[in-house]
Amino acid sequence: MNPIRKIIHIDMDCFYAAIEMRDFPELANKPIAVGGDAKRRGVIATCNYAARQFGIRSAMPTAHALKLCRELILRPVRMDVYQKESQYIRSLLTEYTDLIEPLSLDEAYLDVTESTQCQGSATWIAEEIRARIYQTRQLTASAGIAPNKSLAKIASDWHKPNGQMVIRPEDVSAFVLDLPVRKLFGVGPKMEEKLGALNIKTCADLQRYSVEYLLQKFGTMGQRLYELARGIDNRPVNPERIRKSISVEETYPKDLPNSEACLAVLPELMARLEARIQRAGKISGIHNLFVKLKFNDFQQTTIERVMDKLDLIVLRQLIQEGFARRGMPVRLLGIGIKLKQENTYQSVQLPLLDL
């Protein structure tokens, strides 16, 4: 019988912004954001909690963020600095387990099931890791401890910033009952809206539906919803996980009727993609750009082109070519990059959204 797993999700608190406040103490307690220049149509990569009180968030156009908060202090992205901090923290994590799955520069999963550190207590391991990060780097981290990855990630967000939460195996069934479905992995605003139309707001509501019904209603996502609503997630922590692509997509409440409508929403998708690439840190270089369109008859097409950089003009061309394949209203539009599968890593130069 396999032992009950002990999974920790470590999530640095507003990582880039926290580094800026540490390195420039005069910024403490002031609303700051890290991102591109508003004059060049840049986007916010991240911001501190003081800025979030004004409604500022990652992937927001910098110009809009400055309208929300005129006192906002904008800091340029110092990716080399953030990468060095991330490497230091990751080396610290390896003292506790070899089973580490980094998700980005500022978060990672750890499987400490077999760890003998801190008397084998996942709670104590998480506390010690967070304390050591603060003592050595003057940065705070939040942590979630649970029997699986999805619950650990939910828990790490529960007492942010600079806190942690434990979901014990015997508490899982009770914990998920009142959990809003929007907290589940893969449930974004559109899926939350679809579930809400069925009066599904919590996992308890979701548990009332059979897996057959959920599969019929939501396809393969239905199986995932069925399991997550019961606190089930058997995905292993995968140290060998290699990111092959970075993408964003949106399902629209009203179909996009033509290619012009698709092009009109491209700037927002581009801003989100740029922010996601920035958060990924060093990547192995861009190999392809691609566009995905799902039409209102649920048929899907993907079109890509070999490119070594993010290029707005090429993405526009791909959208037009993809739309022409069926010429029907579009319900989902996505854009992304495929990465070179090499051992040499680099920072990608982004176009700063000169739209």
Swiss-Prot record:
Compartments (UniProt record): Cytoplasm
Record has Nucleotide-binding as a keyword: no
Stretches that traverse the bilayer: none
An MF annotation (GO) of this entry: DNA-directed DNA polymerase activity
Domain of life: Bacteria
Record keywords: Cytoplasm, DNA damage, DNA repair, DNA replication, DNA-binding, DNA-directed DNA polymerase, Magnesium, Metal-binding, Mutator protein, Nucleotidyltransferase, Transferase
Binding site for Mg(2+): D11, D106
Residues with site note (Substrate discrimination): Y16
Primary location group: cytoplasm
Catalytic class of the enzyme: transferase
Active site per UniProt: E107
GO BP term (any one): DNA-templated DNA replication
PROSITE patterns linked to this entry: UMUC (PS50173)
Keyword check for Iron-sulfur: no
Start and end residues of each UmuC domain: 7-188
Reaction catalyzed: DNA(n) + a 2'-deoxyribonucleoside 5'-triphosphate = DNA(n+1) + diphosphate
Annotated cofactor note: Binds 2 magnesium ions per subunit.
EC number: 2.7.7.7
Cofactor(s) listed: Mg(2+)
GO CC, alphabetical: cytosol
Entry similarity comment: Belongs to the DNA polymerase type-Y family.
Assembly and oligomerization: Monomer.
Role: Poorly processive, error-prone DNA polymerase involved in untargeted mutagenesis. Copies undamaged DNA at stalled replication forks, which arise in vivo from mismatched or misaligned primer ends. These misaligned primers can be extended by PolIV. Exhibits no 3'-5' exonuclease (proofreading) activity. May be involved in translesional synthesis, in conjunction with the beta clamp from PolIII.
HAMAP family: DNApol_IV
Protein name: DNA polymerase IV
Native species: Legionella pneumophila (strain Corby)
